[in-house]
Amino acid sequence: MATFSTKRLAALAALFFCVVIATCKPVTSADVKTKGEYVLDEQTRSTLAYKLAPFLVSYSRAAATRTPAPYVKMMNDIIRDPSLGIGVDIECDACKELMKAVDDLIQTDESRDLIVEIAAEVCKTLEIEDDRVCDLVVREFKDEVIDVATLHYLSPDQVCGTLLGPSCAIPYDYNSDWNVTFPNIPKPHMTPVQPPQPGSPTLRVLHISDLHIDLMYEPGSNAECGEPLCCRSNDGPPAPGTKGAGKWGDFRTCDVSLDLMKNTLENIAKTQKVDFIYMTGDLPAHNVWNQTRSDQLKILDMVTDLLMKYFPGVKVYPTLGNHESAPVNSFPPEFITGDQSEKWLYEACVSSWIEKSDWLPKSAKETMLRGGYYDVLVYPGFRVVSLNANAGNTQNWWLRINATDPDAQLQWLVSVLQAAETAKEKVHILGHIPPSQNLAVWSKNYELIVKRYASTITGQFFGHTHKDQFKIYYDNVTNRQPINVVYVAGAITPDTQNPGYRVYTIDGNYTKSSWAVLDHDNYYLNLTEANLTDKPKWRLEYTAKKAFNMTSLQPSEWGRVVEEMKKNETAFDQYYSYFHRLWEGRSPCDSSCRQNMICDIETARSGDSSFC
């Protein structure tokens, strides 16, 4: 996760839209009633672009939350501004003619170059980022954004229906409904998981996420550089009177140095018994405006080497984060071939995770190459499934082409879980982006799968948010019976929280094991203290059962924890401090904040707050 990707990529999309409008060829619409020749002169085109850009930024954000209606009036008010001298309304007919011109415009290389130049200028004029970032980010995303626009099957009618509403044309909804299919096999009755007998074998599972390693991190450098990522060797010294980047890390929009990464792994290796590792994505840094594929692959291989060094012979089960690709969030479906294909990343994962490290069996290769996901039988009766959650990523522009179960991943998940149920196996599911933050329709289908196979799925493990969280799946609104839990482990990179990692204790490898999560221990590094003393000291932050007064980590117990937080501010405040890993700089959380955070726990499905 990155502030840049969620906050500014919407602006980038808007910039490309406004550039297309600003550079369009003459369109045939004198006004909305009489067809004729209508031409925007150069000055008007430029003015229109600058006026539309902030609107389009807002509209992009609103569209993501499915509340764009107020912005339609704003657009018309902008277009009708007398200072533009256009004298017409951009209403339905005019919009359709304009979109036809857009289709023509993006087909030539010359137009692409012009789009890039003007988009960069608009970015600078609106001060979305500094000049260097504007120039680089537009070029970084140029091919993806324009290729998606070229391949997109939206007609001018659909575009204008989306912009102007259904009175103009039927809007396009890339979040439109689709459903996975389930085999005609009755769902088994769910029975409470019995606690293991005293002395039963257990396993220890390390969960690390969101490493965000920055090979350009430089202690003492400018930590307030004005760019999305600072503390880098090219940022120069800090301003007079301002502290430079800390030796072990910094909370001011900075990522993880190689020294901190090595220190983290060394500490874990020395102090923890680890049977296997869940690594839930986001290995590269947040410099998303100037990353290359070779940059990403270098980090991928480096992390594999580090884990093999510090944990020899220990299996690692990785999943792909949204930052693994270049550009960030770019995960085209299998049918996209050529330069824009994601084959380069999936082949590298096979090379690193199967051939080099032997973490995964060769049987994982087929689905890894298809869509970056796999399953593996870890022990008899226990299977791990690793999903590529970018198939539901709202910032993955390729989903504008086709968002219906990309690469057939969720239908594949149904088949894996059904086979596991039949074989009486238990399953842990790994992913990067929690389902509650993905496309609503993808998240809905995932929820249907969880509800159907709740007795088979004994744990879900995600990252992305950088925070220590959990989420609950309930059977239905009426009963409110918790049936499954999503664990979000937090990040190693400092981002309004101290670096940290988690170790789960799970029911172990023996006949009739439940393979359930029995407890988890959470460790953190007080970054402020580490920078002051130059002696990083990792500490136990909390143990779940003790901290939340739980008898087990079954879904029903997590449900009880949530109900306690609703009526007991002290209980919530404790959770909130863990949310930030005891970071001293966390903001206070008032009653509205508490309500929203508790609702977030109860919202395991994207856009569905019915359990709040």
Q: Where do the model's predicted regions map?
A:
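Bacterial N-terminal signal peptides that target proteins for export
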Residues: 2-10
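Metal-dependent phosphoesterase/phosphodiesterase active-site architecture
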Residues: 28-143, 150-270, 275-278, 340-419, ...
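Active-site neighborhood of phospho(di)ester-bond hydrolases with catalytic His/Asp-centered motifs
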Residues: 207-209, 275-282, 312-322, 428-432, ...
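Active-site environment of divalent metal-dependent phosphoester hydrolases
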Residues: 215, 285-288, 318-329, 393-395, ...
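Core catalytic region of metal-dependent phosphoesterases/phosphodiesterases
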Residues: 246-340
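Short, surface-exposed basic-aromatic patches at helix termini and helix-loop junctions that form
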Residues: 308-310, 444-455, 473-483, 506
